[in-house]
Amino acid sequence: MKLLLDTTYLLPAIGISVKNVPKDAPIKLLRKGHTIFMSDISIFELSANGAKYVATGKLPAERVTRGIRAIVYNETIEKIPIHDTTLLLTAFKLRSLLSDFIDCLILSAAIDKCDALITEDQDIQNLKENKEFKGLLSSANPSFKIQTLKESL
């Protein structure tokens, strides 16, 4: 399956651990035979999160930059640009359903290019039962799924 990973699963690469998320989640998914994608906006999110940790002295800047470089240059993770017209138009539609536009961009990238979005985000998970969201999927990607990591492994 083509899976787009929410930024949460990439945070361990820059030195930020996330409760109940294994630091090797991308590797586990690759070993299961999945193709891994990420939105380019996740690089911004990783940088912003990393900056908070660097500013408070919890992480050295080099740890964050090394992790970001490792992700950017990792050829097993396919990157999806955020400037694609179709992706943006879908993100604009999603904005009425989600308050966080970064989440809209990530979800839109997944809908456009992948079989599923892997996320623990409750606001996104709640869309699975949303009538308007189901209508959007019926024309954009009818077989698309929103899953947690546990559901994907």
Pin down the residues of each PLM region.
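Short, flexible helix/strand-to-coil boundary loops that buttress conserved ligand/catalytic motifs
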Residues: 14-15, 50, 128-129
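Acidic, PIN/NYN-like endoribonuclease modules and their adjacent C-terminal/linker elements
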Residues: 80, 111, 115-153
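Active-site neighborhoods of divalent-metal-dependent phosphate/nucleic-acid chemistry enzymes
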Residues: 76-122, 126
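Amphipathic alpha-helical repeat scaffolds of TPR domains
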Residues: 44-48
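Short, well-structured N-terminal submotif of metal-dependent ribonuclease cores
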Residues: 1-41, 53-66
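Short amphipathic alpha-helical interaction patches enriched in hydrophobic/aromatic residues
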Residues: 11, 50-54, 75, 95, ...
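Helix-adjacent hinge/juxtasegments
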Residues: 56-83
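Short, conserved catalytic or adaptor-binding loops enriched in Gly and charged residues
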Residues: 26-31, 69-73, 135-141
